[in-house]
């Protein structure tokens, strides 16, 4: 390329031409760097694809169980329902993670341990974990101050301040059993505790642990506690525990024997975990009279908390909580609390909801005393029915 090609006359100074060449050189250098960067990126992508292709071409591995570690390089493994082998351990396997009972991948040719597999769990057990923290707080519970204090001392305090128990020299409670009539706030207390404590909350209903085939219920209980240990700190909440914790009888059917196996596994798991650890268990029932005595002894459920029907003061607190966002006009909550003797917390919530529905039915934006009177009649029924409910609760719960 000459001076004439770029339009510069021979008589002109060569400085402009030199500046043009320098600018052109910078442009070419920039293009070279861009192409080199693209080349490196494509080489990395090619390397990744080759590695992926190499992995896909590898033969499948056997799944087995680690039985025993012999030394740093050898172990005894067992293929599922097969013989046992003394095999080598691949150098890239972290030895501290190899424990008896762990699931491992075995090479097809040499049977060497080439990978540590995650523990096997039933999908239903994984579904017990509550991902979203409940929105219920302690302020949403009325009339249960004493019960909340006992629950927080037994569950929340050991998780947040374990050093207090070490200084005093005692072991914290392993578990808490909440018992009382239906609708009195047992499940609500557990939800509030999960909201306040920064821990994994695992909720399961007792009937979900009852299975048709032999050994399935016991396996679910074992995997439930294994999940809690992996997710620690964790709280296991078993609602309606009487479904698996009823008293064992001498004469049983096949289904009852399976329930008894599930109960025995639960007892074994509760005996097995450390009370000073980060796993706590809460259970709830409205039939404490039918629970197996082995479940209630100290060392399993160390604290039994009764959640009774609310008295007048408690009913007034519950009504204030449920009506704090309602537009009331001329409503005396003390009268409502006096008229609802024998009602549970769930009944009181239903009464406030029905009172609001009566106001909406009349196209009003406020709730009156008359609305509450109608709601009491609808929810609790006649005085005779109400007295029958009170008598039934007294017979059942004393």
UniProtKB/Swiss-Prot annotation:
Coiled-coil ranges from the UniProt annotation: 18-59
Protein name, entry field: Proteasome-activating nucleotidase
GO terms for cellular component: cytoplasm; proteasome-activating nucleotidase complex
Gene that this polypeptide is encoded by: pan
PROSITE patterns: AAA
Entry keyword set: ATP-binding, Chaperone, Coiled coil, Cytoplasm, Nucleotide-binding, Proteasome
Residues covered by region (Docks into pockets in the proteasome alpha-ring to cause gate opening): 396-398
Sequence similarity: Belongs to the AAA ATPase family.
Residues annotated for ATP binding in this entry: 183-188, 322
Major subcellular site: cytoplasm
Disulfide cysteine pairs (residue numbers): none
Keyword Chaperone: yes
Domain observations: Consists of three main regions, an N-terminal coiled-coil domain that may assist in substrate recognition, an interdomain involved in PAN hexamerization, and a C-terminal ATPase domain of the AAA type.
Taxonomic lineage of the native organism: Archaea, Methanobacteriati, Methanobacteriota, Thermococci, Thermococcales
HAMAP family tied to this protein: PAN (MF_00553)
Organism: Thermococcus onnurineus (strain NA1)
Subcellular location(s) of the protein: Cytoplasm
Molecular function, one GO term: ATP hydrolysis activity
GO biological process, any: proteasomal protein catabolic process
């Amino acid at each position: 390329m000459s001076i004439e090609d770029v339009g510069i006359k021979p008589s002109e100074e060569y400085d402009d031409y030199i500046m043009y060449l320098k600018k052109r050189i910078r442009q070419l250098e920039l293009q070279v760097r861009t192409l080199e960067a693209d080349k490196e990126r494509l080489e990395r992508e090619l390397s990744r694809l080759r590695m992926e292709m190499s992995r896909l071409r590898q033969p499948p591995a056997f799944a087995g169980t680690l039985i025993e570690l012999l030394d740093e390089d050898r172990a005894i493994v067992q293929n599922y329902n097969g013989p046992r082998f003394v095999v080598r351990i691949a150098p890239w396997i972290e030895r501290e993670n190899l424990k008896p009972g762990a699931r491992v991948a075995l090479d097809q040719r040499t049977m060497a341990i080439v990978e540590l597999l995650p523990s096997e769990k039933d999908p239903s057990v994984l579904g017990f974990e509550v991902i979203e923290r409940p929105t219920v707080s302690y302020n949403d519970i009325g009339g249960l101050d004493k019960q909340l204090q006992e629950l927080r001392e037994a569950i929340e305090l050991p998780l947040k301040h374990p050093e207090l128990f070490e200084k005093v020299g005692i072991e914290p409670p392993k578990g808490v059993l909440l018992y009382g009539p239906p609708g009195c706030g047992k499940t609500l207390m557990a939800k509030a505790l999960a909201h306040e404590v920064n821990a994994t909350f695992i909720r399961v209903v007792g009937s979900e642990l009852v299975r048709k085939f032999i050994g399935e219920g016991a396996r679910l209980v074992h995997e439930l506690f294994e999940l809690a240990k992996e997710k620690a700190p964790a709280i296991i909440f078993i609602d309606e525990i009487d479904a698996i914790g009823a008293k064992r009888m001498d004469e049983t059917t096949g289904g009852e024997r399976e329930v008894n196996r599930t109960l025995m596994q639960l007892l074994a798991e509760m005996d097995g975990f450390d009370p000073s650890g980060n796993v706590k268990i809460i259970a709830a029932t409205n039939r404490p009279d039918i629970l197996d005595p082995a479940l209630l002894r100290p060392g399993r459920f160390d604290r039994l908390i009764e959640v009774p029907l609310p008295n007048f003061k408690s009913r007034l607190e519950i009504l204030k909580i449920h009506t704090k966002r309602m537009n009331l006009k001329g409503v005396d909550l003390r009268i409502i609390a006096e008229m609802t003797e024998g009602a549970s917390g769930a009944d009181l919530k239903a009464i406030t909801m029905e009172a609001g529905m009566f106001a909406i039915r009349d196209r009003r934006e406020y709730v009156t005393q008359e609305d509450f009177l109608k709601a009491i009649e609808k929810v609790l029924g006649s005085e005779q029915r109400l007295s029958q409910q009170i008598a039934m609760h007294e017979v059942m719960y004393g």
